[in-house]
From Swiss-Prot:
Part of the 50S ribosomal subunit. Keywords: Metal-binding, Ribonucleoprotein, Ribosomal protein, RNA-binding, rRNA-binding, Zinc. The gene is rpmE. Zn(2+) binds at residues 16, 18, 37, 40. Binds the 23S rRNA. SUPFAM superfamilies: L28p-like. PANTHER family: 50S RIBOSOMAL PROTEIN L31, CHLOROPLASTIC, LARGE RIBOSOMAL SUBUNIT PROTEIN BL31A. This is Large ribosomal subunit protein bL31. Its cofactor is Zn(2+). Disulfide bonds: none annotated. Transmembrane segments: none annotated.
Amino acid sequence: MKQGIHPKYETLKVSCSCGHTFETRSTRSEDLHLDVCSECHPFYTGKQRVMDTGGRVDKFKKRFGALGKKDS
């Protein structure tokens, strides 16, 4: 590799709004703040919920249900 053309690779501190912090390496020089990380995101914590707010599935089936039916 050529010397002096690559950005400096530094250690930076990553912090989340939940309070979890960790260190990683990057060419970014300033610290990084995240809104959601693997410690607090529902997908990773197993607290994921599937919600049908306002009956959206039923509304969709009501509008487009007839399109999927086959004539015999």
